[in-house]
Amino acid sequence: MIRSLPTMTVLIPLVSLAGLLYSASVEEGFPEGCTSASSLCFYSLLLPVTVPVYVFFHLWTWMGLKLFRHN
């Protein structure tokens, strides 16, 4: 069953934030060791930032197309 768009819009950033908080609590050198692209910590910071931004701009584009079509 496919979830509705408003549910996914809220669910994806919350799951990303939970992953960020989990990695912050588990990783010992969380802020210091996240500079190298080869570390797992780098990607645990990158995904929670990238996913909500992608969802926001995808919805922004979709709303722009809807508003443009109705004007």
Curated annotation (Swiss-Prot):
Component of the glycosylphosphatidylinositol-N-acetylglucosaminyltransferase (GPI-GnT) complex composed at least by PIGA, PIGC, PIGH, PIGP, PIGQ, PIGY and DPM2. Interacts directly with PIGA; this interaction regulates glycosylphosphatidylinositol-N-acetylglucosaminyltransferase activity. Does not interact with Ras proteins. It is a multi-pass membrane protein. Disulfide bonds: none annotated. This is Phosphatidylinositol N-acetylglucosaminyltransferase subunit Y. Keywords: Endoplasmic reticulum, GPI-anchor biosynthesis, Membrane, Transmembrane, Transmembrane helix. Pathway: Glycolipid biosynthesis; glycosylphosphatidylinositol-anchor biosynthesis. One of its GO terms (cellular component) is endoplasmic reticulum membrane. Residues 27-44 are lumenal. It comes from Mus musculus. It is found in: Endoplasmic reticulum membrane. GO terms for biological process: GPI anchor biosynthetic process. Residues 1-5, 66-71 are cytoplasmic. The chain crosses the membrane at residues 6-26, 45-65.
